[in-house]
Structures are given as C-alpha cells and as structure tokens.
Amino acid sequence: MSLPKNKSFKNDEYSNIKFYQPIGLYILDCQSPLGAIPSLKNGKLDPWDHIESTMGLTTLGHYDAAKLGFNWLFNNQNSDGSWFSEFKNDQVIQANKQTHFSCYVTVGLLHFFKITKDIDFIRSNWQKASKAINFSINLQNTNGTIPWCINEDNLPDEDYLITASSSILKSLECAMALFNILEDKDKAKLERWEFAYNKLRQAIRNPDGLFDLKISRKRFSMDWYYPVISGAFSTFESKDFIKKTINKFYID
C-alpha cells in the first residue's frame, strides 16, 4: 500500500473519522507481525514515532494493533526503564537513550485509556511505564533541566533540548493522571513526579541559558510551539507567546 495521496479539505469532511481511515490502513501496513511500527515503511523505528503511530491506530479503532504496538515497546524496554533510540528489523542500530522517548509512553497509554477505557491493559503495564518515567527524572539537575540523552558510553549528554523537555513535561502530566486513574497508593512516587514536573516547568518558563547550549535552534518552529503545547504556560500566556513568534514562521 502506498502513502495516502495529498488532498485538500472540503467542507466538514475532515471531521468524519472515515476521512482518516486510509492513514490507519497505512500504519497497519507498516506494522511488523511483532508490533513494531517504523517511522517510514521498511525504515528505522524510533520509540517516540512508534508511540505516535500507536496512538494513530487507537484513534482509528485498531485497538488490537495498538496493543501489539505497546507490547513491542515493553518487550524492548531496557532494564533501567529506557529504550534505545533506533531499531531496524527489531535490531538496535542506535544505542543512545533519549530521555523524552522513555517518558512519552505515558502519553500513549493515557490516550489509549481515554478512548478504550481498558484499565486492565493500563494496569498491566503500569510498573514498566513508571520505570520509564523514573529513568528520565533520575537524571534531572537542580535547575530542573534533564539531559536529552544518555550516550553510548552510558553518560549524560551535556545539552538540554527545549523540545525534548516540553515532551517530558507533558509526559509527566499524563503519568500523574494515570496515577490517579489507577488509584496508585505510592504517595512518595507521586510526590517525586510532582517535584520533577514543577522544576522542569519552571525551567521551560525561564529558559535563558538552560537549553540548546550546543547549537542555536531559533529557526526551528517546533522550538517555539512545543513549550506552548507542553502545558508550561497558561492560556493567556500561550496566546501572547504565539503572537510574538507567529510572524517568524507563518506563511499566508
């Protein structure tokens, strides 16, 4: 199956789930029998894109395939809660460990629960998801920042990406929501996550000198909108933030 053809929106057709079904079929066509979903058909897989694709399957009603995607993910989780950065044909091809990759599983799981209400599936993977969150926040510095990865020598990289950090912040929010949904009784865990969330949120709100130390990323639009969708800012602040930056990236 080939990629869906480009098409323009007409009237309200994009609000009908049928409009998106070809996307779901394409993701299914890319998924391996074991559940892996590469970023490109027959290409490499990274865990963040894999989770995004799994969420696409959930949205379009392919619940068993989505579960298979989560199962692949947890079957390939490292003992420290992380995932390696890239796979191909279920083999590791990039052995660093990106911190926002591990956290993002909670976004996928909360999304799956919101649609399916399958709390048993969430509960069966909760310990592994909690371990994934802890992998990232274990690396948090006193200023709130979290290294973007552990390199192949198992050392923290000395840079902190605003995009990755924004993703981690949203993932922590979803983790705490799942904690309450599952009625987890480990209050120490929740307090630790709340502390990490607040420290990271403060860093994202006051980013000067903290992020993207090795290379300027001001020309990348995602570095401007990721902090907005992370939840670090209020609605009013977000609108003001967008007004100040939209002319740099918006093309009429």
Q: What are these regions, as identified by a protein language model?
A:
Residues 1-48, 59-73, 77-83, 136, ...:
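Low-complexity, Ser/Thr/Pro/Gly-enriched N-terminal "stalk/linker" regions
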Residues 14, 43-46, 124-127, 131-133, ...:
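Extended ligand-binding clefts on enzyme/binding-domain cores
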